[in-house]
A protein has these predicted regions:
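Acidic donor-binding loop of glycosyltransferase active sites
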Residues: 74-87
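Nucleotide-activated donor-binding/catalytic signature segment of Leloir-type glycosyltransferases, i.e.
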Residues: 47-64
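Short glycine/proline-enriched, acidic/aromatic patches that form the donor-sugar handling elements
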Residues: 69-70, 87-89, 107-113
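Short hydrophobic beta-strand element within catalytic cores of glycosyltransferases
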Residues: 101-105
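A charged, aromatic-enriched C-terminal amphipathic alpha-helix characteristic of glycosyltransferases
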Residues: 124-127, 138-173
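Short acidic alpha-helix that forms the nucleotide-activated donor recognition element
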Residues: 65-76, 97
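Conserved catalytic-core segment of nucleotide-activated headgroup transferases in glycan assembly
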Residues: 1-51
């Protein structure tokens, strides 16, 4: 079931990582200057990742707390599953629960259950991922369509439909 998290078409993308191995990051940052990339790690960041601060659309969060991570989910409308290595704190599922549009590379996916097939790209083609992001961010209907594809892929059931079905099964009684 989806949470009641809203997606506001904000041009904010979240990446949670344990390492500085983030597939296609520089290409994406350069090709999507209007998108803010919020990259968070539970630890210190390497000089390689810190060098990304030379881009105005990159914000880094080192030694991030669980509370800060929760806040980042609320501030972002996109999650990029493009980091190599282990998944941080079930990030993909948490992004799905917060109604973030999730995109990733085939080579870096951590939990494909929550990612629509059309939002998975080969790492040799970051331009396709960027193009799909631009399309989703171009309007409410485009984002809604992308999120619906994501929900269908995950066999998501909106809370309202779940409640209606439950009420009809219980004879319309309220508890």
């Amino acid at each position: 079931m989806t949470s009641s998290g809203a997606n506001y078409l904000r041009k904010d993308a979240l990446i949670l990582t344990h390492s500085d191995q983030i597939e296609g990051l520089e290409t994406l940052v350069q090709s999507l200057p209007q998108l803010v990339f919020r990259i968070a790690a539970l630890t210190e960041m390497s000089p390689k990742l810190l060098s990304m601060l030379s881009y105005k659309n990159v914000v880094l969060y080192q030694n991030v707390s669980l509370k800060q991570i929760e806040q980042l989910y609320l501030e972002s409308d996109i999650y990029l599953d493009i980091n190599h290595g282990g998944q941080v704190l079930q990030a993909v599922r948490k992004a799905f629960e917060n109604n973030l549009l999730i995109l990733g590379f085939e080579q870096t996916l951590h939990d494909r259950h929550y990612i629509a097939r059309e939002h998975i790209f080969d790492s040799s083609q970051p331009d396709q991922l960027a193009s799909t992001l631009e399309e989703a961010l171009s309007g409410v209907e485009q984002m809604r369509s992308a999120l619906q594809a994501q929900g269908r892929h995950a066999n998501d059931v909106p809370v309202s439909l779940y409640q209606e079905t439950l009420q009809s099964l219980l004879g319309g009684q309220h508890g």
